Curated annotation (Swiss-Prot):
It comes from Clostridium botulinum (strain Langeland / NCTC 10281 / Type F). It catalyses: Release of the N-terminal residue from a tripeptide. It is found in: Cytoplasm. This is Peptidase T. The gene is pepT. GO terms for biological process: peptide catabolic process; proteolysis. Transmembrane segments: none annotated. It is an enzyme of class 3 (hydrolase). Binds 2 Zn(2+) ions per subunit. CDD domains: M20_peptT. Keywords: Aminopeptidase, Cytoplasm, Hydrolase, Metal-binding, Metalloprotease, Protease, Zinc.
Length: 408
């Protein structure tokens, strides 16, 4: 029987970055290849009804070993890693019995995980921690979640004395580019409720996400020879700068926390003739979320009025909504996860997700899906790390949740 660390280290060797630019499903071929490998592993450990569809969704069933009817529960994680940093040739290192000091990730490039910048790592002093070599992300988001779920399923299969109802397992592609639930067949999955294992540090239990939208701003300039440009040229670069500065300077990710929302400028492509700005818009409060969408549109209108012509076009598209609306209708799914953590000596930390998970969309598709910790920190970057004990406890948590549902 493989342990969770062995599985995790094997999974991160496979580059499964998703792509913002691709229109294929999944967005990268490597995700589909990884999905097939996971399907084979699920069959090998004894799960039933294993399927891998053409879109890369993996589903499987652990059959109930009790007579009474209890809700079928699902455990879900995503296979892709973020396109924000390379996931190719990940070279992890295990820092044994972490001593509480800065960790040199890459001596040659002077890349150091510093405790004054990432003080949360001190919570894991004395534990074994998996880190990167400074060149790539680690992939704990969310291959730690996959490793934890499969390890828990194998444990339940090997320990039939632990009673449980029907358990559904699901692995999704393209979560990191906001498409993880696009082709998820809730009816086929067959769960009454589910949990994603896509959270951060040990103890995190999340039933609130942002309301989310994206905005594309297209600016049409007019290029004229600079020597004769007076009253003729419209420099789209400068108009883009004006647009950026008309949004609140403090309502950005780097200056907000907790329940505060923001506008996040993802990218700028600009030259005199044309410019494109790509934003994401986030807020927990639905009313404030709607106001933010109107606010960014209003900036475009004001600039058009100033130039007395339509040079700015703002297109806003909703991405997902705060799953709290749906989770509150079946609050017991959170209560059971809370009790399960307490039962295995984990202090639950109820926090809002300053982001989204597949569960955000799935909850609005009829599958209430709060989020559990997967154990990692500093996702999407070279300073990502995951304590081994956190992964082990996450796998234990999955087992305990299944057990508590059987005893309801």
């Amino acid at each position: 029987m493989k342990d969770v660390l062995e599985r995790f280290l094997g999974y991160i060797k496979v580059d499964t970055q998703s792509s913002e630019e691709s229109d294929t499903v999944p967005t990268t071929k490597t995700q589909l290849e990884f999905a097939k490998k996971l399907g084979e592993e699920l069959k090998a450990i004894g799960l039933k009804d294993v399927s891998v569809d053409e879109s890369g969704y993996v589903m499987a069933t652990l059959e109930s070993n009790i007579d009474k009817k209890v809700p079928a529960i699902g455990f879900i994680a995503h296979m892709d890693t973020s396109p924000d940093l390379s996931g190719t040739n990940i070279n992890p290192r295990i820092v044994e019995k972490y001593d509480g000091q800065d960790i040199v990730l890459n001596k040659e490039k002077n890349i150091v995980l510093k405790i004054n910048e990432f003080p949360e790592i001190l919570e894991y002093k004395g534990q074994d921690i998996v880190v990167t070599d400074g060149n790539t992300l680690l992939g704990a988001d969310d291959k730690a979640g996959i490793a934890e779920i499969i390890t828990a399923m194998e444990y339940l299969i090997n320990h039939p004395e632990i009673k449980h109802g029907t358990i559904k397992v699901g692995f999704t592609p393209d979560e990191e580019v906001g498409k993880g639930a696009d082709h998820f067949d809730v009816k086929k999955f067959g769960a009454d409720l589910a949990y994603t294992l896509d959270g951060g540090g040990i103890g995190e239990l999340e039933c609130e996400t942002f309301n989310a939208a994206k905005a594309k701003v297209i600016i049409e300039g007019r290029n004229v020879h600079p020597g004769s440009a007076k009253n003729k040229m419209t420099n789209a670069v400068l108009v883009a700068n004006k647009f950026i500065n008309m949004l609140p300077e403090n309502e950005v990710p780097e200056r907000t926390e907790g329940y505060e929302g923001f506008f996040h400028l993802l990218s700028v492509k600009s030259e005199v003739e044309t410019a494109e700005l790509n934003y994401i818009i986030r807020d927990f409060d639905r009313k404030k979320f709607e106001e933010r969408k109107e606010q960014i549109k209003e900036v475009g209108k004001k600039i058009n009025e100033e130039y007395n012509k339509e040079i700015v076009c703002v297109k806003v598209e909703d991405q997902y909504y705060n799953m709290k609306e749906k989770i509150d209708e079946v609050k017991y799914v959170v209560d059971i996860a809370y009790d399960a953590m307490k039962a295995i000596d984990i202090e639950p930390i109820l926090v809002p997700i300053r982001g989204g998970t597949d569960g955000s969309r799935l909850s609005f598709m009829g599958l209430p899906t709060p989020n559990l910790f997967a154990g990692g920190h500093n996702f999407h970057g070279r300073f990502e790390f995951v304590p081994v004990l956190s992964m082990e406890k996450a796998a234990e948590l999955v087992v305990k949740i299944a057990e508590l549902y059987a005893n309801r």
